[in-house]
Amino acid sequence: VASKSIPIQVIYLVIGVLIGLAAGYGVFSITTPSPRPGEVPTGEGRVYTIGFTLPLSGELSSIGKIWEKVVKLAIEDLNNEVKAYGLNVTFNYEILDDETKEEKALQNVQTFAQKGIKVVIGPAASAQVKVVKAFADENKIVIISPSSTAPTLALKGDFIFRTVGSDAGQAKALATLAYQEGARKVIVFHRNDEYGKAFADFFINYFKGLGGTAVSQPYQTGLADYAAEVSALAGRVQSEGFDAVVLVAFDTDGANILSHAAESAILSKVRWFISEGPHGASELLTQSIGEFAAKVRLYGTRPLFIANPLYIELNSRFKERFGLELSVFCENLYDAVKLAGWAIIRAGSYDGEAIAKALVEVAKTYYGPSGWTAFDEAGDKAMQDYGVWAIVKTAEGKYEFKDVGVYERGSIVFIEVAYE
């Protein structure tokens, strides 16, 4: 996925085109007879339910709990937007916890299918998306993941859509960041799952192409503690002379790994780089991890278009209402809700195939907090930008996540100083 910038001046024009088209199709939708399960006609119009399978517990729970709030805000905004155009349509939502587990995500999608729900947003992890794919395709249920990024799932002609670019792009950005920062011999410490393995493979290929050397060291997922795994990593770093560690993790495992790394004299002497997975998790904002981040000059990448005023506006509203900053993929989740709603309206019938086709068309002209949402031929976000983030100390002595750079035209450009 190439990193491309979108001119800010087209934002409002694009949104106007989207809403104009969607509103026109919405009038047709309201007059469509024969409601199906998941679509409820009332005296005041039609009510549609969008299903959500989110990681409210398990390895992505820190981020999942933030996402739950994003869903609430996005549904409210969608309903207000629809009503502003005079459409007698209301969207409800149902959230089920998938515990960041593959089989639980499948159970949730099956539960939604039994209720006649044709659009499900989530699951979060690529391993989960891989498991639900066959059922979704067979039953023509539209799956929109805001965060699955494994390149191995970039497949044509299925019912899986992703409002984020695949890690083929992010791995290139992270490899560029590490090399530009002086890393030459890297060990990639990664989750031994669909996401981690694919990310590591792409990173290693890109990093070698830049002139560096890199090897992978997978770790088992789902452990209560990673002390032994971090100890083994330290031993290998010392014996083989690596000058940097690249961590590809989720939030709970990532925080646990960094907490143990902070106690290692060996791992505190090499540079650290990190994927988007742990971004936004409060567990990373402890004093020990914050001090470690400064010591090793920890930088990460994440899908983000920093110069997007719609993202800034959403983050401001979210912080005012919930007292929190947006975490990784919040903007992708928000846009997934908007796309799903307008695709249902535009489809003209509550049918998975019709909604999938409408989704592609709506995304072509929708520009939201995550940027331009057009899909490529595999159903992934076609134009994905990447930002660089760090963990920095505030004036009050606390720690926070901060976006400090961008991946632009094949190189990293820092816009703020993260570490002295």
Residue ranges and their predicted role:
Residues 1-42, 417-420:
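Secretory targeting signatures
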Residues 13, 112-124, 144-146, 187-190, ...:
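Periplasmic-binding protein-like
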Residues 35-41, 45-47, 62-69, 81-155, ...:
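Beta-alpha junction/loop-to-helix N-cap segments that form part of ligand/metal-binding clefts
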Residues 46-49, 87-92, 115-120, 138-143, ...:
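Loop/turn elements at helix/coil->beta-strand transitions in domains of secreted/extracellular proteins
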Residues 63-81, 104, 170-173, 194-213, ...:
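Short, solvent-exposed amphipathic alpha-helices that sit
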Residues 150-152, 157-264, 304-313:
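Extracellular/periplasmic Venus flytrap/periplasmic-binding protein
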Residues 258-334, 345, 350, 411-419:
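Extracellular/periplasmic periplasmic-binding protein-like sensory domains
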Residues 318-330, 341-401:
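Segments of small-molecule ligand-sensing domains
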